[in-house]
Each structure stands twice: as structure tokens, then as C-alpha cells.
């Protein structure tokens, strides 16, 4: 069987109506999966099956999983993609804003994962849960401290769930760097080329491809891992740049 053929598989993508989430949903759909996406507002374009859900509410997270099982008969893959945060200076941001950021980016994925595990652990073949993190959780994140802390916590959550829920359920993280067109930030192409070794941001489809890999039999022994999709990271500004002309790195 083709390892990236998801025909007959049931997949849920939270925050799957735009940006990276929409690309992930489209990739699984193209691979033959039946896909259910959720968001707090309806999508503006045609997408796979959609249900409105605010996954910060554990009851709505459970209802999302139940809706998937009702449609597909089983649930094979959950991609916890919903998240994000506005720019906020840590010294002056309100406690309420910080709490909401952590709730959306850390607590909500736990709600969805708990509901998914209840189903996956009881079905033949188990299942896969993928957390969409961020490089903001791996290095200082000025202007988004609470977001970076939540994403760091999300990776730790994934490793803990991977240990607790093995062998039936595999849990991994995807850790994107700058992504073009995801709507979360405005990228300066020159700054990205100067900072990222590969010389450009990722495309949403490139993040989606890694999700396909982690959900497939090709990653059957991979759990508790964090796969960086960041083009080589970020060249430290205080080190001499040894990489050659910028133009050579963006091709």
C-alpha cells in the first residue's frame, strides 16, 4: 500500500479554514482522507466538511471529535493547528490577554487531544495526534512572550502525551518557522533571506507535507518528536555570515 495514501482515514484539522490549517486540510484531502475542519467562524471559500467550534471550550472540543466519528466511523488523525496571538509587550499586556493566549495555544489542544484519545485508544490501529507549534517556543519571543511560552509548553505536552498514550496513539509536534501567506505576520523577504539559511519562508504546503509524513506509516516509530520546518533555523546576528551572497540562498 502507498504509505501516503489516506483513503478511508478520518482526519480533523482545527483552525483548518485558512493559512497553514487550510493547506493541511487540503493535503490530507488530496491524499484520499475524509477531512473535517473547525473554526470559530465559517470559511469564506469551499473547504472540506466544516463545523463551527471554539476548542477552548472542552465541551465543543468533545463535540468536534464526536462529529468526526459520526461522519467517518472512526478518527485516525487530529492536527491541532488552531492558535495564534497578537503582538503584545509582556510588561504591559493585560493578565486577561496572557490567559487567553495560553488558553488557545496550549489548553485548547489538550482538550481536543483528550477527546481524540478516548476514541483512538479503543479502535483498531489507534491514531495520530499532531501539534502545530512554532519556533517562537524554541527561542526568545519578544513581543509574543506568552505565545512563545505556550508553544514551548505545547511541545512538552506532546512528549508527555506520547509517553502516556503509547502504543495506541502517536503524538508529535511540527515546528514551523516563518511561513509565507499564513496570515499571522508580515514577512520582510530581505530579512528572511538574511536570517534563514534556506533564504526564504516555508510555504503552507511544505508544513502540510510534514504533517502527512508524521501521520503516515513511514513515521510508525516516531512519537514524542518535534520536527522543525524552519529552513535551517536563524543565523545568529552576532556571528560572521559565512553563507555567501543572499541571492544564492533564495533559490
Label the model's feature ranges:
Residues 110, 201-229, 234:
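C-terminal substrate-recognition "lid" of short-chain dehydrogenase/reductases
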Residues 1-2, 139, 223-251:
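Short C-terminal tail/terminal secondary-structure segment
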Residues 134:
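Residue(s) in the substrate-gating loop at a strand-loop-helix junction
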Amino acid at each position: 500500500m502507498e504509505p501516503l495514501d489516506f483513503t478511508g482515514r478520518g482526519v480533523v484539522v482545527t483552525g483548518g479554514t485558512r493559512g497553514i490549517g487550510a493547506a493541511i486540510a487540503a493535503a490530507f484531502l488530496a491524499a484520499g482522507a475524509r477531512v473535517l475542519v473547525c473554526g470559530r467562524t465559517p470559511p469564506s471559500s469551499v473547504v472540506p466538511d466544516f463545523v463551527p467550534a471554539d476548542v477552548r471550550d472542552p465541551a465543543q472540543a468533545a463535540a468536534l471529535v464526536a462529529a468526526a466519528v459520526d461522519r467517518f466511523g472512526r478518527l485516525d488523525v487530529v492536527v491541532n493547528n488552531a492558535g495564534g496571538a497578537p503582538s503584545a509587550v509582556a510588561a504591559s499586556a493585560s493578565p486577561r490577554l496572557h490567559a487567553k493566549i495560553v488558553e488557545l495555544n496550549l489548553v485548547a489542544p489538550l482538550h481536543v487531544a483528550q477527546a481524540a484519545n478516548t476514541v483512538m485508544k479503543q479502535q483498531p490501529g489507534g491514531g495520530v495526534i499532531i501539534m502545530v507549534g512554532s519556533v517562537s517556543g524554541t527561542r526568545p519571543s519578544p513581543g509574543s512572550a506568552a505565545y512563545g511560552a505556550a508553544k514551548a509548553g505545547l511541545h512538552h505536552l506532546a512528549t508527555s502525551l506520547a509517553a502516556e498514550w503509547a502504543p495506541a496513539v502517536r503524538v508529535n509536534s511540527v515546528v514551523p518557522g516563518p511561513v509565507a501567506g499564513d496570515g499571522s505576520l508580515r514577512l520582510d523577504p530581505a530579512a528572511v533571506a538574511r536570517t534563514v539559511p534556506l533564504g526564504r519562508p516555508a510555504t503552507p504546503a511544505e508544513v502540510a507535507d510534514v504533517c502527512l509524513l508524521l501521520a503516515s506509516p513511514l513515521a510508525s516509530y516516531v512519537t514524542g518528536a518535534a520536527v522543525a520546518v524552519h529552513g535551517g533555523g536563524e543565523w545568529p546576528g552576532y556571528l560572521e555570515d559565512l553563507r555567501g551572497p543572499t541571492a544564492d540562498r533564495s533559490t
